[in-house]
């Protein structure tokens, strides 16, 4: 009997062991750090990480994205936590769909990677309001990100909520889960100088609060040089080989190695050559760095109204190794994969010693690491931006391309050079899907009735977000002006000029129901002015200004105080009595569009809506027009997009879900040749000059049904829906 039990016990042990080996689920129990590296279960690790933000893709995409990240050589998935997505109103929480944080982390765990959970809860990230819920702005006495009681109370409450949720699911490494790191605050250093002692006090409070949550894993602060112990301060940037942590017993970590850059409407599309990105990573490693996170590894899509900035595009592709649609971008993906393999071959030596640096020439160096049993690793570097170099190292000859590093895991043989790219460049095409739009219909916003429903009236011009609370991009400002019958312009004289000064971001101007034009700011200059001659009549004239937000700011000192909307002046010039300032007269305000209040985007919207159908629906190209059409899901499994080049500016929905803002703003910039060598900045390698910044808009296949998918567009400027199409993204 004893023998039988022993045999059964061995069989059970074998089966359990086999299951664990076959499973890639991460199992941790101890995460600490020392001066060299993050230490997991007693072992120093070189950790390669990539940012994937769960709301910027769909749950159906997550597993494939994470598997591609693992296959690309990553150890860790990094993500922010998006407060405004999770707590849209005080005490009301959302952890469903794209905001299902638990499902996202479980997926990472099941694939077999670690997690760096950057709780913040300020995220920046080109995300609307930097991740803060707009209601937070209206808490009595609040001031963001400083030694302020109301802010600290709200921040602590949300942070505790997330930490407790992670603990309940046993997600922290100390519980056997995948979370090995957490971040409190984010990129605070740029704002610290302006805050003085209150800023330092806030940093110390945030650190103490986070550590007191007893997660059992290290906490970091990125771009915060005075992060107090035991918090690890880390680096963000295009390069971080210059960075040293604030204490000699902390590891050297790079939380954001920028793989590219974001795009803004009206701007070019930045590209970062992979040769330079790999060079930056290898430079960091050879200087003793042990943790690198690519921001972004998959950028994804700013669905809905989540894009910040303002003026950040719906696409958040970021020139990442995995593109917006979930396809690998070559040669970036494979070249970095080969870099990761080379670094991992060197791991034992890299975490065992500091580099010994030897000059090999004016621009050339050798960084040598050694470990036990004669182990030797070398990084041979050529910093020259134009010329290759021939060097001698260990009595052997090597050729180093310009601006490159060769990695020698045995101090003899080169296994990788950052500037020598073997992978072929992806050939990306947007091809017809075969799916056509049918049952096209149109609904025109009724300008004449604005001011008659759901309005407030006040003297003077009100700040936009104070009225809308960011429930909509749109706010109507309407007023009436009386014109004397004796005005000379009514008898053939020059029309008066209307000027409107706005704090951002766009405005469409109507007088007596007639459209007189639009004006826009930019991300760099949100404020702008509109000016146009207008045809007024004797008696009462109605001025209607539709102010449009294009994402709330996500970065800058106390950006919660920045104004949006028409808060400058509104003036009529050229009247017989001179100028007439309308700014302080009675104005009526209406948040949102009629189509929004009627829920025209919903597949179950009221059938009594008077849509214009048939050929007439395609003929009107006036501003403020709703379009709807239907299409069937294209065959195959290629990613899909809407081609909106024929449209102007607005928003788009598929089956009631917003795919984001669109705008055919044409890119201005210098799109000349791009040399990988030399220091990279976001304006160095530009593409897309003379084309719309974003023409195609991602349509997740999981949002579609086989037949009868509803497309709704709200067009602000005037467009041609007959030329809108559904396309497939093809990569060869």
From Swiss-Prot:
Superkingdom field: Eukaryota
Keyword Transmembrane annotated: no
Documented EC number(s): 3.2.1.23
Residues annotated as signal peptide: 1-23
Ranges annotated as spanning the membrane: none
Annotated GO MF terms: beta-galactosidase activity
Enzyme class name: hydrolase
PROSITE patterns: GLYCOSYL_HYDROL_F35 (PS01182)
Subcellular location: Secreted, Extracellular space, Apoplast
Catalytic reactions on record: Hydrolysis of terminal non-reducing beta-D-galactose residues in beta-D-galactosides
Glycan attachment points: 466
Annotated family: Belongs to the glycosyl hydrolase 35 family.
Protein name as annotated: Beta-galactosidase 5
Species this protein is from: Arabidopsis thaliana (Mouse-ear cress)
Name of the encoding gene: BGAL5
């Amino acid at each position: 009997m004893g023998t039988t039990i022993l045999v059964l016990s061995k069989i059970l042990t074998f089966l359990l062991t086999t299951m664990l080996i076959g499973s890639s689920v991460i199992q941790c129990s101890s995460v600490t750090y020392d001066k060299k590296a993050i230490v997991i279960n007693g072992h120093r690790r070189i950790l390669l990480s990539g940012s994937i933000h769960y709301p910027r893709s769909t749950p159906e995409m997550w597993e494939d994205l994470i598997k591609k990240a693992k296959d690309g050589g990553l150890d860790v998935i990094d993500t922010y936590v998006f407060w405004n997505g999770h707590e849209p109103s005080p005490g009301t929480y959302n952890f469903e769909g794209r905001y299902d944080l638990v499902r996202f982390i479980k997926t990472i765990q099941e694939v077999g990677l670690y997690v760096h959970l950057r709780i913040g809860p300020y995220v920046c990230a080109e995300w609307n309001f930097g991740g803060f819920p707009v209601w937070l702005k209206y808490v009595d006495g609040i001031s963001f990100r400083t030694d302020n009681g109301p802010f600290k109370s709200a921040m602590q409450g949300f942070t505790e909520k997330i930490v407790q949720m992670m603990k309940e699911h046993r997600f922290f490494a100390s519980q056997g889960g995948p979370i090995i790191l957490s971040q409190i605050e984010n990129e605070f250093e740029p704002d610290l100088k302006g805050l003085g002692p209150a800023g330092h006090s806030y940093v110390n409070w945030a650190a103490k609060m986070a550590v007191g949550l007893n997660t059992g894993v290290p906490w970091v602060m990125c771009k915060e040089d005075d992060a107090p112990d035991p918090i690890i301060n880390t680096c963000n940037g295009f390069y971080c080989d210059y960075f040293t942590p604030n204490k000699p017993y902390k590891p050297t970590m790079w939380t954001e190695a920028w793989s590219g850059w974001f795009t803004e409407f009206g701007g070019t599309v930045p590209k970062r050559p992979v040769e330079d990105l790999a060079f930056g990573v290898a430079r960091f490693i050879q200087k003793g760095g042990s943790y690198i996170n690519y921001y972004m590894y998959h950028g994804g899509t700013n669905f809905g109204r989540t894009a910040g900035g303002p003026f950040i595009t719906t696409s958040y592709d970021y020139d990442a190794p995995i593109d917006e649609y979930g396809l690998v971008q070559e040669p970036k993906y494979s070249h970095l994969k080969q870099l990761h393999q080379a670094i991992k071959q060197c791991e034992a030596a890299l975490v065992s010693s500091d580099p010994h640096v030897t000059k090999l020439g004016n621009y050339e160096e050798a960084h040598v690491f050694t470990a036990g049993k004669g182990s030797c690793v070398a990084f041979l570097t050529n910093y020259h931006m134009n010329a290759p170099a021939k060097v001698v190292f260990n009595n052997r000859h090597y050729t180093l391309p310009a601006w490159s590093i060769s990695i020698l895991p045995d101090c003899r043989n080169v296994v990788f050079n950052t500037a020598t790219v073997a992978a072929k460049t992806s050939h990306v095409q947007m091809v017809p899907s075969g799916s056509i739009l049918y049952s096209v219909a149109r609904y025109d916003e009724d300008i004449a009735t604005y001011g008659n429903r759901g309005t407030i009236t006040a003297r003077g011009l009100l700040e936009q977000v104070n009225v809308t609370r960011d429930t909509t991009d749109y706010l109507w400002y309407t007023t009436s002006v009386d014109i004397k019958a004796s005005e000379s312009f009514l008898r053939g004289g020059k029309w008066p000029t209307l000027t409107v000064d706005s704090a951002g971001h766009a405005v469409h101007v109507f007088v007596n129901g007639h459209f007189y034009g639009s004006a826009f700011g930019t991300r760099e200059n949100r404020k702008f002015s509109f000016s146009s001659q207008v045809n007024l009549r004797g008696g009462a004239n109605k001025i209607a200004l539709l102010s449009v937000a294009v994402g709330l700011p996500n970065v800058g000192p106390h950006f919660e105080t920045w104004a949006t909307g028409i808060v400058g002046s509104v003036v009529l010039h050229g009247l017989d009595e001179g100028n007439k300032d309308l700014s302080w007269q009675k104005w009526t305000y209406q948040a949102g569009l009629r189509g929004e209040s009627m829920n025209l985007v919903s597949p179950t919207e009221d059938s009594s809506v008077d849509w214009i159908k048939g050929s007439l629906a395609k003929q009107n190209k006036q501003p403020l027009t709703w379009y709807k059409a239907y299409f069937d899901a294209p065959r195959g499994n290629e990613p899909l997009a809407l081609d909106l080049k024929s449209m102007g500016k607005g928003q788009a929905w598929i089956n009631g879900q917003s795919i984001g803002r669109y705008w055919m703003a044409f890119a201005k910039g210098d799109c000349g040749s791009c040399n990988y060598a030399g220091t990279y900045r976001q304006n160095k390698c530009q593409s897309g000059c003379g084309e719309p910044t974003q023409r195609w808009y991602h349509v997740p296949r999981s949002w579609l049904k086989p037949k009868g998918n509803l497309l709704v567009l709200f067009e602000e400027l005037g467009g041609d829906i007959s030329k809108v199409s559904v396309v497939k993204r093809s990569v060869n």
